[in-house]
Regions:
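Flavin (FAD/FMN)-binding glycine-rich loop and adjacent Rossmann-like elements that form
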Residues: 55-68, 111, 123-135, 151-152, ...
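A conserved beta-strand/loop element that lines the FAD pocket in flavoprotein oxidoreductases
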Residues: 161-171, 507-519
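Beta1/beta-strand and adjacent pyrophosphate-binding region of the FAD-binding site
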Residues: 71-82, 435-447
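Structural detector for internal amphipathic alpha-helices that build alpha-solenoid repeat scaffolds
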Residues: 792-805, 809-833, 841, 852-877, ...
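Conserved N-terminal glycine-rich FAD pyrophosphate-binding loop of Rossmann-like flavoproteins
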Residues: 105-128, 471-492
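Short beta-strand to alpha-helix junction loop
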Residues: 139-153, 340, 490-501
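Amphipathic alpha-helical scaffolding segments comprising HEAT/armadillo-like alpha-solenoid repeats
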Residues: 777-787, 804-816, 832-855, 877-891, ...
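Short, low-complexity, charge-dense intrinsically disordered segments
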Residues: 9-12, 16-19, 24
């Protein structure tokens, strides 16, 4: 590697490449062992002439044939988010085309914001309408841009023009019609894979990935190294170029073929030279480089001087032999000097307007016909252009893969799981996914749990890769909601825990890091997960591992692999609030459905609109507290917490108080088993975490760490603290390496040495190691009888309920002889209807009392009236309906009625009696209850005083539908919410509607 001094152009030799690994023989043994493992899944060596750079591979894994859901049908699809594509989208949309932009980041643009190149060069003078609108007040001299304002301005321009866009979506394939012409793109994101049908595609990726996937070819890659650069804000890097507070520094990185691992290695080399991570500072998410190759296009511009956007031959942007595709960026057929200009925002934007006009005309003229396309010349051509072909398919690879035991598993539920009108599917034939690497341990997610997992495994001698979706390490701890609140104050988490220090430790441990790499699938051999499918701006690739650790925070790999999970709690609208830094100082906002692409995109856009307008930049992530909760071999519930349940496979301890950031949903909490709250215990309480809660049920080779481990919603509120997740990740990484080294599986690994090590470093105490690494026994009959005498005691109630159906005979007898409210509640929790009449009469005898208005930290107690209304729904006995209806009629429509309404509508909905339908419909017809659907996206809808209105409307409508509905009112409301921008409302409404059709809800 050589360092390039941008100011002088001088080079100096720093060290040889590649660096020699310490303990070379051991490392080589690990590599040989890993590739021996690969042989077991029957990979096939193939050659493929048409693969994009970065997809060249000698090993491939099979992706069997499947149907992909269609997420959109548009006239023009823009892939990538540089200023050229944005200007083209803006221009075409204003001319009348339907346009969708998909970009891999959570913001625009790829060449300015993503690289933190927030300046205009002195010769950049806006000429076009779009560039003048964006830059008019910023041009002149070397003007610098304010990151937050720049991102907002782009989004405002696109939204005003009617352009739709999806963030965090990357291209993975192309669609073709019967004639073999491009008719759309396959995208990957946190919702899985989707197809977008389009008449014209504008490819703004730096490598022309869409064009290459469609068969375009490039000039030869004939260099061994490439100059790469990176920008840091507020720092001076030796040899760098200073532009205001920005510093761009460069080096020459080895890159003999441009593969994705080589590009990621270049990212690491740049960060080894200088690394600084600060979520609200405009640091680069990715490196800058000029590709040494270009596409072969219909024309080529060989001059070194930029001719101007109005003079460049547009044939330079048309890949040879690939109609209906434009390349708009440095992949165009131009000299590499001009390619540099095509990474600058003003030239790109001005050229983009020309291409936008041309693309609009071409889309209007393209008419789909069976077997191909014909140009439209008749007056009815525009109407015919809206007809879509029935013969679309994903373009197959040049070579097919022979039958293999391993296969790729994807999420195929669509970009919005319960979208009202299906756009259909397109067939994907069997494909070959290139393998980009193989490791002992693959950690997906370089955040709070992922970094310690990788360090622990690597320090035990494992060959480890971190796959990170963003361009920075740190995850939610560093980039979403920074800081600590409670947590177990011992062990690995006591290390100085910042992303910069973590990066240095990872490199010292020889951990590879792949930035800007999205996990979009799993490689499976039967029920064993043996790799991950990745999406990048080069397309798809796979990395294989003996153990995969899902540290995504959202259980993305687990979900793709087919693991079961709870999400929005399976039909109960209950999810902890998110936080978006800089909306307020520490704003709690609407919970985010990360697997709804439209909602995820709008959440970021609206948070920027609603937030403080004078901030320098925004944190790159919405700080999520809860998304998917995986169903592991054991699901920790509040009974386990109250009893302090221990496990023979104990590997971590959480220490916190109950901190729901919303409300509870467990029958156990309503029965009286709320864990100690932050008002009851300042230091917190212990929850013991077993290995089995990190093992997704039915899957081998896979561990899940972070906030999505196998717990219930109400437990998760006290085990998701950053300090605890650091220790949890470390334990998982250490366990993975130990299992590999000993030749065991994750379920058969010897736990004693692992627990000894965790006690040695303080992750668990020595007392825990000696006394609590055992399974708590099941309650004895004597203990169950004793519990009946004191059900006001949380431990005694928990003991009784842990007994399950064994507790029922004694509980029934005790209630019959001496009925009490506590015994009646316990019977209901266990699903027994013996106390329903007693509770209904008790409810009628009680005033409704004061309820609790919605507030993020308000629900730290359960009044008896609300407890009874909720629990009466558990046995599903219609004798409770009349009393519940009378309480519903006493409720107000908002404010402090929120907690009452949640409890009573839940009770009625679970019983599902038609006798309650009229009362629920009457409630919905009260003034102010209906009409809170938000399709377009009001920035204020992020705030609790607004979204709580939708909560109440949805609680009542969901209960009404479950009770059989009344004049179609409930279904009409839920159907309307299927178009709401807020994904959690779409998911809840869709789940309730699906219950009645037998189509089911979540896994």
């Amino acid at each position: 590697m050589t360092e390039t001094h941008l100011a002088t152009g001088k080079h100096r030799q720093e060290h040889a490449w590649p660096p020699r690994a310490e303990g070379g023989d051991a490392r080589n043994d690990r590599v040989r062992g890993t590739w021996a493992f690969l042989a077991s899944i029957a990979l096939l060596a193939l050659a493929s002439a048409g693969q994009p750079a970065g997809l060249a591979a000698e090993r491939w894994v099979r992706s069997s044939a499947r149907d992909l859901p269609v997420s959109a049908r548009v006239d023009i699809l823009v892939v990538g988010g540089n200023e050229g594509g944005l200007a083209a989208a803006w221009t075409a949309a204003r001319a009348g085309s339907t346009v969708l932009v998909v970009t891999g980041n959570y913001f625009f643009s790829d060449d300015v914001s993503a690289k933190a190149r927030y300046w205009l060069e002195p010769d950049e003078v806006p000429q076009g309408e779009f560039s003048r609108a964006l830059f008019a007040e910023r041009s002149g001299g070397r003007a610098t841009l304010t990151p937050a304002q720049y991102k907002r301005d782009i989004e405002d321009l696109l939204l005003d023009a009617g352009v739709a866009f999806h963030f965090n979506s990357k291209p993975t394939g192309v669609l073709v019609d019967g004639a073999g012409h491009v008719a759309g793109v396959v995208t990957a994101n946190k919702a899985g894979l989707q197809a977008v049908i389009a008449k014209v595609v504008i490819d703004t990726t730096p490598t022309g990935t869409v064009a290459r996937l469609a068969g375009a070819v490039t000039t030869p890659w004939s260099v061994q190294q490439v100059q790469v650069s990176r920008v840091s804000y507020g720092a001076r890097v030796p040899g760098g170029r200073q532009i205001g507070e920005f510093c761009e520094y460069a080096l020459d990185a080895p890159m003999p073929d441009g593969s994705w691992p080589q590009r990621c290695r270049a990212e690491v080399l740049l960060r080894e030279k200088h690394d600084r991570v600060d979520g609200k500072r405009a640091h680069a998410q990715c490196l800058h480089m000029i590709e040494p190759v270009c596409l072969r296009t219909e024309a080529y511009e060989a001059a070194d001087r930029w001719p101007g956007a109005d003079q460049l031959d547009l044939g330079c942007c048309l890949p040879a032999g690939v109609p209906y595709v434009y390349v708009l960026g440095q992949a165009a057929g131009v000299s590499r000097s001009i390619a540099e200009q095509l990474t600058r925002p003003v030239p790109l934007a001005d050229l983009g307007e020309r291409i936008g006009r041309r693309a609009h005309q071409q889309a209007a003229a393209r008419v789909w016909v069976t077997g191909g396309l014909t140009p439209a010349r008749s007056p009815g051509a525009q109407a015919a252009a809206r007809d879509w072909p029935s013969d679309l398919a994903v373009r197959p690879d040049a070579a097919a893969v022979a039958d293999a035991e391993a296969d790729v598993s994807d999420l195929l539920t669509g970009h919005r799981r319960y979208v009202r009108s299906s756009l259909g599917t397109v067939p994907q034939p069997e494909l070959a996914i290139p393998v980009w690497g193989a490791y002992d341990v693959v950690v997906v997610g370089g955040g709070t749990s992922g970094i310690p997992a990788a360090l622990a495994a690597a320090r035990q001698g494992a060959k480890v890769l971190i796959v990170e979706m963003l361009g920075q390490l740190g995850g939610n701890r560093e980039l979403g909601t920074p800081g600590y609140w409670k947590g177990y104050p011992y062990g690995f988490n006591q290390w100085k825990w910042r992303a910069v220090e973590a990066f240095a430790e990872l490199r010292q441990a020889d951990v590879d890091i792949w930035y800007n790499t999205l996990a979009c699938g799993a490689v499976k051999q039967a029920d064993r997960v043996c790799g991950v499918v990745l999406a990048t701006h080069l397309g798809r690739g796979a990395v294989l591992g003996q153990v995969v650790i899902d540290a995504t925070g959202d259980a993305d790999v687990c979900a793709a692999a087919g693991a079961g999970f709870a999400y929005v709690n399976d039909g109960d609208l209950c999810l902890q609030e998110a936080s978006f830094r800089d909306v307020d100082l520490y704003a709690n906002v609407l919970p985010l459905d990360h697997a709804d692409v439209h909602s995820l995109t709008m959440h970021h856009v609206l948070a920027r609109k609603a937030g403080k307008q004078d901030v320098w930049d925004y944190y790159p992530l919405v700080g999520l507290r809860e998304t998917r909760l995986v169903r592991g071999d054991h699901v920790i519930d509040v009974i386990d917490q109250i009893l302090g349940r221990t496990y023979r496979d104990l590997i971590s301890v959480s220490w916190s108080a109950y901190d729901p950031h919303g409300y509870h949903n467990s029958d156990l909490v309503y029965a009286g088993l709320m864990p100690p709250t932050k008002h009851e215990t300042k230091p917190g309480f212990a929850t013991y975490i077993p290995l089995r809660s990190l093992l997704p049920q039915g899957l081998d080779g896979l561990l899940v760490v972070g906030r999505c481990l196998s717990v219930t919603h109400d437990v998760q509120a006290s085990v998701r603290m950053n300090a605890d997740l650091i220790n949890l990740g470390y334990a998982a990484g250490y366990t993975a390496a130990h299992a590999i080294r000993s030749g065991a599986t994750l379920r058969t690994v010897e736990l004693g040495p692992i627990q000894d090590h965790l006690a040695e470093i303080g992750n668990i105490s020595r007392e825990d190691r000696l006394q609590r690494c055992v399974d708590s026994p099941e309650p004895t009959d004597a203990e169950l009888r004793a519990a009946l005498d004191d059900l006001e005691s949380k431990p005694q109630l928990a003991m009784l309920l842990r007994g399950g159906r064994r507790s029922l005979p004694g509980l029934r007898a005790a209630f019959a002889s001496a009925p009490t409210l506590a015994k009646a509640k316990a019977l209901c929790v266990l699903g027994d209807a013996a106390a329903v009449e007693y509770l209904a009469a008790w409810l009628d005898s009680q005033p409704l009392g004061a309820g609790t208005a919605y507030q993020w930290d308000a629900f730290l107690a359960v009044p008896d009236v609300e407890s009874v209304m909720w629990l009466l729904g558990v046995p599903r006995d219609e004798r409770a309906v009349a009393a519940l209806v009378r309480k519903l009629q006493q409720c107000g429509t908002g404010g402090t009625s929120f907690s009452h309404l949640r409890a009573v509508t839940s009770g009625l909905g679970r019983i599902g009696s038609p006798a309650a339908a009229a009362a629920l419909a009457d409630f919905l017809r009260r003034p102010g209850v209906q009409g809170h659907v938000d399709v377009r996206g009001d920035p204020q809808s992020l705030r609790s005083d607004q979204f709580v209105k939708s909560y109440i409307e949805l609680f009542a409508a969901g209960a009404l539908v479950r009770c059989g509905d009344c004049d179609g009112l409930g279904r009409a409301i839920l159907n309307a919410y299927l178009e709401d921008w807020r994904g959690i409302f779409v998911r809840y409404a869709g789940h309730v509607l699906a219950e009645g059709t037998g189509s089911g809800g979540e896994k």
